[in-house]
Amino acid sequence: LGHPEVYIVLLPALGIASEVIATNARKPIFGYRAMVGSILAIAFLSTIVWGHHMFVTGMNPFLGSVFTFTTLLIAIPSAVKAFNYITTLWKGNIQFNPPMLFAIAFVSTFITGGLTGIILGDSALDINVHDTYFVVAHFHLVMGISALYGMLAGMYHWYPIMFGRMMNKNLGYVHFWITAISAYGVFFPCLLYTSDAADEQLS
């Protein structure tokens, strides 16, 4: 159906980010019940948003409105998770070690991907940016980079527990900054380039 797999890849990263942020902020995750409810809502809603990939195929306008609604609806539990991550950081005793930096970067790309997803979820806007680099940037920020940050945060966080050896923290910082700058360096220009491409399509 073309969309649940995005969230299936993201769900472990969401859980890892919750663990890493709570541990390194030295406080429990804010709104635990809301976090559980929102992850269940995301898991369910991800199965009924696939039609937003088909807005430009001559879809029935009523059906397009339904898929616009469900796609925008999934932004609510996603926003709850992002808000709770940020609120957990608020006034926390934060340790900015490599796993925490990757977890914060995950939240950053999750928010960026979510905001671009709202644009793509609206059928009127999606028609204008369909087949542009905007979609490429959105997809890779959400599916690729966010999942990668979650995996790396978990790797740096649990490696010492699993293997009884510490990883080199300085190399971890170098790894983080190269990855973060490269990821946004590749995909942020795609978002900017799209505005020119969309203008050319409209004119």
Please provide the spans of the model-predicted regions.
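Juxtamembrane/interfacial segments at transmembrane-helix boundaries in multi-pass membrane proteins
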Residues: L1, W90, I111-T132, S195
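Short aromatic-rich membrane-water interface segments that cap or initiate transmembrane helices
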Residues: L1-E5, F67, T71, H130-M143
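Short helix-boundary/re-entrant hairpin motifs in multi-pass inner-membrane proteins
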Residues: L1-G51, V80, A105
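Hydrophobic cores of alpha-helical transmembrane segments in multi-pass inner/ER membrane proteins
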Residues: Y7-G15, L72-N84, G144-G154
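Interfacial and helix-entry/exit segments of alpha-helical transmembrane bundles
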Residues: I29-F44, T87-G117, Y133-V136, L141-G150, ...
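Membrane-interface helix caps and helix-loop-helix hairpins in membrane proteins
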Residues: M54-P61
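Long, K/E/R/D-enriched contiguous segments that form extended
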Residues: P61-I94, P98-A105
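Single conserved hydrophobic/aromatic residue that forms the stacking wall/gate
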Residues: Y193-L202
